[in-house]
Amino acid sequence: MWRLPAFAVGCSQVVLPGEQPALVRNYDYDQALFEAVIASTDYSGRRRVLGTSDMLWGLLDGMNEDGLAVSLTFGGRPDVGEGFGIPIVLRYVLETCATVEQAVSALRRIPVSQSYNVALVDSAGHHATVFVAPGQPAEVSELHATTNHRLDQVEHPTHAARFNSVGRLSRLDELRTGDPSGRQLVAAMLAPPVRNDQFEVGFGTLYTAEYQPAAGVATWHWLETSWTRGFDDPDDIREVRLA
């Protein structure tokens, strides 16, 4: 996964730190390019990982049994450079890191091929959002919510406007000021303007993932159903309607 072809669209993510930390994210993409696999793995034999698979062994989001959760959103820049594809970077972080501090250190040193906002939270309630881009140092922030521009800075207004990046972020920031519960946040993520239904142009919300690293469980939400998984759950299948 080195210097992958450019791919982008949407996604929204929010970190809830504190005593019961959570990471909630919407994945907005082309349904035809989605693997629709939730992978529970123990590749190293030392650290189990649970997350949404991409490119067979990469991850779009996930959590490990140490209590570290991670997800991504496209960072708004169209350029591609020398570096690893972000799915394998997220896999590496969850395979090798136990805390937000360790994950930030890893993201500082790993070159990436495109720009992304990477949200992190651990079971101790520590959090960070890291903007990574090809050819530049990682930018570390304490932002709780990000959509599809560089942290809270719009660099490419046309793309941001096309996918309502600012509008979605404004809604997430508004929610954050009300100190929402995880349930309230999930409900908002499943409703406009955060949820998207432009499936015909590859901009539909394929799932809302809710990671609870202290509890060791993750739940994938859709309009009509939810599916909670833990590290010890057996293989299973769910069929869902996206719209």
Task: For every predicted segment, state its role.
Residues 1, 17-243:
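C-terminal, well-structured catalytic/ligand-binding subdomain of enzymes
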Residues 1-17:
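Long amphipathic N-terminal alpha/beta scaffold segment
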